[in-house]
Amino acid sequence: MQHVLRTRGNSAQDKNKKHVPNVPPIIYDDMQVPYEKGAFLGEGGFAHCFEFRKLDCNDRLAVKVVPKVILLKSTAREKLTREVEIHRQLSHRNIVQFHHFFEDSQNVYFTLELCSKNSLMELNKQRGPLTEHEARFYTIQVAEGVKHLHNLQIIHRDLKLGNLFLNEHLQVKIGDFGLATFCEKNEKKMTRGGTPNYIAPEVLNETGHAFEVDIWAIGCILYVLLFGSPPFESRRVQETYVRIKNNDYVVPENASPTANRLIRSLLDPVPDRRPTAEAVLLDQFFKTTIEPTYPPVHQQLHKEQDVKYFAPINPVLPHVEEPISPIYQEVANEETSEIRRFVKTEQASSFGDELSQLQAQISHILQNVVASKNKSSTRFGLNHSPEATPIFWVSQWVHFPNHGIGYRLCENSSGMLFNDNTQMKVNSAGNQLTFVDENNTEQFYTMNDQVPMNLQTKINIFSNVQSYMNTHLEADTHLEAEDQCVNKVPPLRNFARLPTIQNWFETKSAVIFHLSNGTVQINFLDHVKMVLCPLLKSVTFIEENKRVSTFTFANILTNSCPKKYLSRIEYAQAKIKLLRPTNNQEHVVYVDSPCRPTTSNTAHGAPLASSRYLA
């Protein structure tokens, strides 16, 4: 958890964190509507957050819980009152929706929109630096939300990746208004608070601050999205403050001129020289058009092939692309001009290091937890760490011996690893195709692009594999029930880089996948999935009934975890070493496979996957 600076109340806050709320399994609002408690989502400040299901309509919500014992102090009551007063009046597509506020004898509750894809902080941990196109996609949404706040004379004052949540469509939602305040025109606030890596110099210098502190934070956010770490970050907080006061940071040379100029304007040490949120949205960075470096291919696919391949994966719920706002449409239009380009991706040389790191992490867990395996665990509710749940995992797969393995990820994107070590993947909307050749060079295409003739055969194979999965395999839908969402929004384009299967094999007990983002997934024959993420240092278990439990490795070391999971972690330790690449290793390896691939003379071979491996 990031360090939060406050000159007053630090000790009180530390004490507040000891007040873990006693939350009953069923709570009732002031209209006696029942809510059923679900997973623990996280904590911050003096509140804990849980998922709840509203039983009268089955809606799933996030519920922030504050123990009343904390509110005995007037400062805490005033802070909570201000937070509720500000948040409940907000209604915007890029702000977490506030629904309701009520209390019982022990706690105060407020119900919020549930953001199922964690936050940009988790995305940053998994992905590191994003492409400029992706950074534009997220930053423009942050600026839209900030513009709405500033129009209402509200300063957020704690904008950071951890407070920028993502819904199932990767739509950014600004949350946590614990430090927010109203601010009149020409008024200056003197409170010294915020998060060190995002705090503006005028706050540190105590010269008075206003709306410009949020603009500064947008600059820090854009910098982190583009380059992976905050601009003023250092090992010591005080050194970070010195760098902020001196405006001591460097924009990497690989930044585009428009990105460089925008960052420098957002991080201007003089507040009055920073752009307004409205001006940020009009910046050239969000309108930049990069000419395609790959010339169009004149040989065009037949229209029938285009429609068949790029049709929505789920025919029951056809995807409808609608602009959210004019500024979103401009970014979407810019996408097509940049999309046809070759990108040399990082080679797989780091895969062995990632697997070695994961093996070491698991070994450390098993060596230190083995003594506690037999003790009963009764406190797993708060030990769950849903914020460490990976964004992607394999939900379906099928193997055709003559061609390769096709698969679908949990958010409905799909891909295929061909026998010649090339890859093909398509996003969940079915309108963006990526081909990765044997040299690990990526080629991007959209629905309107002319695809080279030499890819037509693989596109046809990939299309047939998708059709097979649609027809024959059980759908592994999102763990959240999207049809029960309160506020439907048009799906946004998914710009997160989709991982691919880099290596896989079968045993008599399971199927093991290694993804390009470092994740290792094991699908057991009893329909339990285990997803190990070395970057988030966590393990996620997905039961046959779709129940999800995520534990950080640190959490397991401290509190152990259910005995039924430890044996699976031991199994993973034994099998991960078989995934480590050797000099001549191909992508696909088979170990003790009960259904070893055989030569087939049919058009696509007999699939070796079956529903027993699927959730």
Curated annotation (Swiss-Prot):
EC category: transferase
Location in the cell: Nucleus
InterPro entries named among the record's database cross-references: Kinase-like_dom_sf, POLO_box_1, POLO_box_2, POLO_box_dom, POLO_box_dom_sf, Prot_kinase_dom, Protein_kinase_ATP_BS, Ser/Thr_kinase_AS
Disulphide-bridged cysteine pairs: none
Start and end residues of each Protein kinase domain: 35-286
Chief location category: nucleus
The keyword Nucleus appears for this protein: yes
GO terms, biological process: mitotic spindle organization
Positions of the catalytic residues: D158 (proton acceptor)
Chemical reaction(s) catalysed: L-seryl-[protein] + ATP = O-phospho-L-seryl-[protein] + ADP + H(+); L-threonyl-[protein] + ATP = O-phospho-L-threonyl-[protein] + ADP + H(+)
Region span, Disordered: 1-20
Alphabetical UniProt keywords: ATP-binding, Kinase, Nucleotide-binding, Nucleus, Repeat, Serine/threonine-protein kinase, Transferase
UniProt keyword annotation of Protein biosynthesis present: no
Protein's name in the database: Serine/threonine-protein kinase plk-3
Lineage: Eukaryota, Metazoa, Ecdysozoa, Nematoda, Chromadorea
Gene that this polypeptide is encoded by: plk-3
